[in-house]
Amino acid sequence: MNQRPSQLTRFRVMAAMALAVLAIYLVVLFNTQVVHHEEYLAKSIQTITRMENVEASRGIITDRSGRTLVTNQSTYSLTFDASLLKPGENQNDAILRLVTLCRDQGVAWEDNLPLSLDGAAHFTVDTLTDTQKSRFFSYLRDLKPTRELLAVYVRQHPELLKAPREGETALDPATAKDTELLKQTNSAALTNSLLLNAGVTPAKLFDWMREDMKLSDNYSDSDARLILGVRYELKLRKLGANNNAYVLAQNVDVAFCSLISDGQFQGAKIIRSSARQYATTYAAHILGTVGGISDYTDDLKERGYRMDDTIGLSGVEAAFEDYLRGTDGKRMISVNSDGKITGEYYSVEPRSGYTVELTVDLKLQQAVEDTLAVKVAQLNQKDHLDSRGAAAAVIKVGTGEILALASCPSYDLSTWRKDFAELRDDPAKPLTNRATNSPYAPGSTLKPATAVAALESGVTTTTETIFDPGYWKYPSATWENKTNCWKRSGHGKMNVTSAITNSCNTYFMEMGYRMGLDTLNEYYSALGLGEPTGIEVGESTGRQAVNESGQDQAPWAAFGQANQEYTPLQLANYIATLVSGGKHYPAHLLKTVKSYDNSEIIATGDTEPLNTLNISDSTLQAVKKGMLGYTTNGGSVAGPFQNCVVSAGAKTGTAQIGGSMKNGVFVAFAPYDEPEIAVALVLEKADAGAVLATTAVDIINAYFDREDTASILPENQLIP
């Protein structure tokens, strides 16, 4: 039967439409697969675009003449980023392959998980730095089983809690939530024994971590431990809201980089980074250290820090962190479906930190450290001691600029992290900056300050003489209650100048008795003793003498034999204040802050006086003359000072520290007529302060013999 015309027409229309759709499909297919093949292929595989932080280089540190002290070196680092894994790629397998490669190639990788399976499972918390302890503790409080056990232990030991900050309410352990309680716990107190006492054993923690990280039983314990070390670090970054890749190994060589670059190790990437490089082995205590953030606070987050950032930990690295820290850049990275990076570009270029120019003179710093080390070595060999220390400070009179600041023994900044445990346990305490953080009894170096106080307060004059029979006693005391002068036969008649030159204890005890302790301390404070010096790094302020058990300490405080203690930096600053007529300048390390290219000055050091003690010219000349007599005409240290290239005033001090042990103390200024520098030295366990005379002469000569490069240095140029 023949089809009707309408049906035939409908069929033809439908066939034409089908042919049209097919034609369109073929055209699109040809256009996609042939004409625009590369373009659409690229689009199909560029599936992920993300932003990555680019660390800025820290600023350079130089001395006052532009000599480089600290700079940066370019390095290669191996990172691991789980987001670069292919879909379906097992993260644990990828980590194990990468760590195995590192082990086979002899590349040390970052593994700070303090859990060892060598022999019997055991903790290694006691070997961690405070930064590492803080991070480990943050993980423990995030892991439910350990959080519960530690919270119980801390409630039983509330002394482990941090003291509340100013304005904060103290936490009630009984009502606080576990997480809040542990956030307020002092992580530095974490030890192997604390964990064990809290019921957290190595075996338990290992099992809990395997469960938390979802490690199957297919992994041996040793392989699981390798994986957990990396997963632990990745977890820390997640807890710190840090999306950056984990730096698995630093300073890897080019040969290792080539193994990673072939794409066989998913998640791995080689990045360029920088590390601190030290152009000198001197000034370690001044320069300080950099490292990881130990307490990742909300304040640091708000200031743009990430948990993995490097930050100044001590010294000027910490004091001038805001200048030295650069501004990180941002880089956009495109990753295809195979986990390969297909493109990257900077959205924000990183900006390096500023250049910090210190007041320190490197050549003088070297001379000071070397001569101190020689003196300490000589006495250690003589006395068979190995725990003796020394310190020195040199200040520019009239500005407060610190030209040199030394603490002996010192350490090597380039290896301090590796050597940390040894340095920490060394009885000589090389990590301690004795010049700023170790207060000492001043002994007779305080006598010039007492002389100023006595003359300016009016209890004596430059012409009054006091007879020294070889002892001093209270007017109402019996002869048996006297205090002997160091010269038992007595000095006879002494005025203020001769009393300084001859270091007459009797004279100064009488002055202390006349003034009283409050007046003495008032003048000592005005000269900078027992007060903050103004230095930008951490320091001890020492302490003024106080009366004990109802006994007046003024006579003994007047010649430095009471209970007062001052740092070497304070002693140098007091001498600088005295010889400048009472202008008390802040001791400081910052000279200028410059832009990275040295084209712009950003900031300068503080050179305004903290206070002024108006010392009369007659007082000043009487005191200076007494100190000059100490170095000339048969004075106690006249012999060594014959080798001094300029005239100088000085005063020694000897302070008993228990039994027959004494510390030697020495202060000086030079030149005599127009003083430029003030010097203070302390030598622990020395027979007397006079043993430091040759050391002081070496330092003064080094200052005046040095090449004054500051006056000949072209602008914006660094010198070697």
Predicted regions and their residues:
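Membrane-proximal periplasmic segments of bacterial cell-envelope enzymes
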Residues: 1-322, 328-349, 382, 390-391
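Beta-lactam-recognizing serine transpeptidase/beta-lactamase-like catalytic domain environment
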Residues: 70, 76, 335-348, 360, ...
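Solvent-exposed, polar/charged alpha-helical surfaces in well-ordered, non-transmembrane soluble domains
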Residues: 92-100, 254, 258, 262, ...
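Conserved, well-ordered alpha-helix/loop/beta-strand core segments that scaffold catalytic motifs
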Residues: 245, 341-390
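Conserved helix-loop functional segments at active or binding sites
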Residues: 374-381, 408, 629, 705
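Amphipathic oligomerization regions
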Residues: 684-706
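Flexible helix-coil linker/hinge segments at domain or subdomain boundaries
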Residues: 705-714
